[in-house]
Amino acid sequence: MNFSEKHTSLIVQGSQATEFLQGQITIDTEKISNEDFKPACICNNKGRVITTFWIKKVEIGFKIAILEELSASFEEHMNKYIPFFDAELKNDDQDHFKKELDSTEWMKFLINKGIVEINKNTSSKFTPHELNYQNNELIDFSKGCFNGQEVIARMEYRGNLKFALKIADNLQDEIKDSLIYNKEGKKVGEVLSLIHI
């Protein structure tokens, strides 16, 4: 899989790397293969997405591709829990991908998949449901507990979602701000990803 030039790579390794990640990330670590990267995220205890990333199995553990601007936030969150496991999180010494995409190509790929990649401006702001992650295989409700899982499960089974992700194209008006208002001046939406093609 190809990533943008804004991504960096981390490694999680150790005899309990799978168990450690299972309690933190939103997908089932038992279903992660070495064939290709899968999208996932970590959430805070309020069920808000701290960051998204892509993960796959490698010989020594798990390789994670993440936006460089959020790698420190990812490490800070994980380092609260990793001391309780025989696991280690470190920078990937072989931090390279098959072919780096430019930002426009990467954004086009994400929009076509219907995935919003969390960045510094959106970190800890949205729930997975507001980003439609439950329909894009970024959440596995059968895997058991993970950080923020109670809040997220409540939204899945009993919640009333006020906002949800939509993809729009052929917009007539030039977007000047990330916030969208109706004619009465009430906020009705927010642009999270935008590409001009």
Q: Model-predicted segments: where are they?
A:
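Basic, glycine/lysine-rich polyanion-binding surfaces/domains
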Residues: 1-195
